[in-house]
């Protein structure tokens, strides 16, 4: 059974400006060390990769029907399997909320261009 869906689109330039303005403070507040390692491994795709992960975190919140005030950005981590397929790992308060709502599986799709990043999340339970 589908418990929720969420979609988010982010302008890549918006995330790039946030990084320029706030630097490491922004990066550490929003992204996990694993996400940062992957995103910064390619300077050419850095901003688009960060924007896609930002969109994924927003899409997870929308799918669960909650706001950011209840959780931390880093409670949702975008991971990749051996074939590069993205997935979401929940921790902390966000994992507790998802479990309380009966979430058993989270599907994630990401896409980005130089201008925009989009994420779609479907939560099953």
Swiss-Prot record:
Highest rank taxon of the organism: Bacteria
GO molecular function: holo-[acyl-carrier-protein] synthase activity; magnesium ion binding
Cofactor(s) in the UniProt record: Mg(2+)
EC code(s) of this entry: 2.7.8.7
A GO biological-process term: fatty acid biosynthetic process
Location in or out of the cell: Cytoplasm
InterPro entries: 4-PPantetheinyl_Trfase_dom, 4-PPantetheinyl_Trfase_dom_sf, ACPS, Ppantetheine-prot_Trfase_dom
Full protein name: Holo-[acyl-carrier-protein] synthase
Recorded catalytic activity of this chain's protein: apo-[ACP] + CoA = holo-[ACP] + adenosine 3',5'-bisphosphate + H(+)
Gene name of this polypeptide: acpS
Keyword Lipid biosynthesis on entry: yes
Classification via HAMAP family: AcpS (MF_00101)
A GO-annotated cellular component: cytoplasm
Function: Transfers the 4'-phosphopantetheine moiety from coenzyme A to a Ser of acyl-carrier-protein.
Key words of the record: Cytoplasm, Fatty acid biosynthesis, Fatty acid metabolism, Lipid biosynthesis, Lipid metabolism, Magnesium, Metal-binding, Transferase
Natural source organism: Symbiobacterium thermophilum (strain DSM 24528 / JCM 14929 / IAM 14863 / T)
Binding of Mg(2+), residues: 8, 58
Pfam family, one: ACPS
Main location: cytoplasm
Family listed: Belongs to the P-Pant transferase superfamily. AcpS family.
């Amino acid at each position: 059974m589908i418990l929720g869906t969420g979609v988010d689109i982010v302008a890549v330039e918006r995330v790039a400006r946030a990084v320029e303005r706030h630097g490491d403070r922004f990066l550490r507040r929003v992204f996990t060390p694993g996400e940062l390692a992957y995103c910064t491994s390619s300077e050419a795709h850095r901003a688009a990769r960060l924007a896609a992960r930002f969109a994924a975190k927003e899409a997870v919140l929308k799918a669960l029907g909650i706001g950011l005030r209840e959780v931390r950005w880093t409670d949702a981590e975008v991971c990749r399997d051996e074939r590069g397929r993205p997935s979401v790992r929940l921790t902390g308060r966000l994992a507790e909320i998802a479990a309380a709502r009966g979430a058993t599986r989270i599907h994630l799709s990401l896409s980005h261009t130089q201008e925009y990043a989009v994420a779609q999340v479907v939560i099953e339970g």
